């Protein structure tokens, strides 16, 4: 056999193995990422934030539900949910049952587009050349948005969609603000704009999609840390290189993890979650395992 056919067969076998790994192994390899952020006043106690995003849950996803149910064992001080919880209305009840152990933990949330309507079949390669939009929303299956909101609020969690809130945790005065989904141009930062209130120890921003305009506005207002999701970490990444897309105007190098947003007014930390799920029409991850994050906020040096 000549060299070229051998190489072709080897390439095909490698591609098939990579696809099988991404579709059947990595997409279910849920993990917890630990991140430290030095943003608290000197002498403060540490604060643990559990950042959950992009579950895209189907009711039949037993392993994902078991992982979610075990998150209470991380003992967070605050839960931040940055949206895209559901892929079908039938997933609402099992989701809330799995989250039930976090019922007594303070929490906040904002919604993403898939908390309003369900996903639709799409060509995943299209994300490499342009951002997905919301033109097809009218043809998508409605999600139980208000039931989801009410369920989170029954836990005592605060809806930050266009709202500000304050918490007292571990002796810290924490201010939070959030926006609706910028990917659908639903963000109206004017609803929450302005500097943190006097006496606030740490100010956090929460949004689903990390578009530059939202990150800039929050940074200009002096927020210490901004939490977002939406990107799936790129979902399909190149080993040694990283993400190819973020489905937003954020640089691919910032598709997941901690980075800084710089404006003329200053800088803010930004944490983008790679999320726990995928669209049910592209249930595949490669070099980008599904995750939640525990952010430990510590005193700044």
Where are these regions (language model features)?
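Beta-strand-turn-beta hairpins that frame and shape the catalytic cleft
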Residues: 38-50, 157-158, 164-176, 198-202, ...
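Active-site neighborhood of phospho(di)ester-bond hydrolases with catalytic His/Asp-centered motifs
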Residues: 51-53, 78-84, 107-113, 160-162, ...
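Membrane-penetrating hydrophobic segments
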Residues: 1-11
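Active-site environment of divalent metal-dependent phosphoester hydrolases
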Residues: 57-62, 86-90, 114-121, 140, ...
